[in-house]
Amino acid sequence: MEYQHWLREAISQLQASESPRRDAEILLEHVTGRGRTFILAFGETQLTDEQCQQLDALLTRRRDGEPIAHLTGVREFWSLPLFVSPATLIPRPDTECLVEQALARLPEQPCRILDLGTGTGAIALALASERPDCEIIAVDRMPDAVSLAQRNAQHLAIKNIHILQSDWFSALAGQQFAMIVSNPPYIDEQDPHLQQGDVRFEPLTALVAADSGMADIVHIIEQSRNALVSGGFLLLEHGWQQGEAVRQAFILAGYHDVETCRDYGDNERVTLGRYYQ
């Protein structure tokens, strides 16, 4: 079967996807090892029998809703290719907004940055790649996530990052940071979106929090006060309807200069503040 023939068939079978053509192209790129430009320019290239079998198996899994990133084992974030697994969240484009806001507020001089609940290491590795002069500490309470983030750091040859197993601040007693960032669990366990799309295949522990999704956010806001240098920043990603509640939590905890930034879809996505000791 030719590349172009397989693409046509795959696109027709993936109409339930938000991006059937791109999904099909990614699977074809993954199995053949060819780039998109080659595939489109040489569409008459023949697939081997083995490639056809691999593609059919992947197509079935994608048709059943399994995330593309789980099928290929890789997701790009901040132009960094990251290994992913069902043990962690798949990095989302909107989380790059958190990285942008963090970079804009880091001091010019070298400093220490903490990423709580690092998962794949996406946020921490993006910051480390942009600020090689800074020391980044990334923590996660799940051993599989810690191993995956360490694998990503090693694969990308990023040296200015230390990845530890820690339940939020439990392994960080006495340490202080100029900035703390986190994309914590923030979805209400009753949210119907948990039964839709990619999140069905992701760990609930990385998605769901008590108190209508606010429990971990409030915990981080309160505990970060002891871990920030005076004037240090805390930046948190949250749900698009949680902006007001998160701002109030920052203010109640005594943070200053509290503001919420919008994501690429113009939704409130990242709230930040400064804490003065």
From Swiss-Prot:
Biological role stated in the UniProt entry: Methylates the class 1 translation termination release factors RF1/PrfA and RF2/PrfB on the glutamine residue of the universally conserved GGQ motif, i.e. on 'Gln-235' in RF1 and on 'Gln-252' in RF2.
NCBIfam families, alphabetized: hemK_fam, RF_mod_PrmC
Database matches in CDD domains: AdoMet_MTases
Outcome, altering N183A: Less than 2% of wild-type RF1 methylation activity
UniProt cross-references to SUPFAM superfamilies, sorted A to Z: S-adenosyl-L-methionine-dependent methyltransferases
Catalytic activity: L-glutaminyl-[peptide chain release factor] + S-adenosyl-L-methionine = N(5)-methyl-L-glutaminyl-[peptide chain release factor] + S-adenosyl-L-homocysteine + H(+)
Single annotated GO MF: protein-glutamine N-methyltransferase activity
Protein name, per record: Release factor glutamine methyltransferase
Keyword tags: Methyltransferase, S-adenosyl-L-methionine, Transferase
Subunit relationships: Interacts with PrfA and PrfB.
Binding site for S-adenosyl-L-methionine: G117, T118, G119, T120, G121, D140, W168, N183
Changes seen on gene knockout: Cells lacking this gene suffer severe growth defects, but also show a global shift in gene expression to anaerobic respiration. Also shows defects in translational termination via an enhanced rate of read-through of nonsense codons and induction of transfer-mRNA-mediated tagging of proteins within the cell.
Amino-acid positions noted as binding substrate in the UniProt annotation, renumbered to this chain: N183, P184, P185, Y186
Gene for this chain: prmC
GO biological process, one term: protein methylation
Origin superkingdom: Bacteria
InterPro entries in the record: DNA_methylase_N6_adenine_CS, HemK-like, N5-glutamine_MTase, PrmC_N, RF_methyltr_PrmC, SAM-dependent_MTases_sf, Small_mtfrase_dom
Signal sequence bounds: none
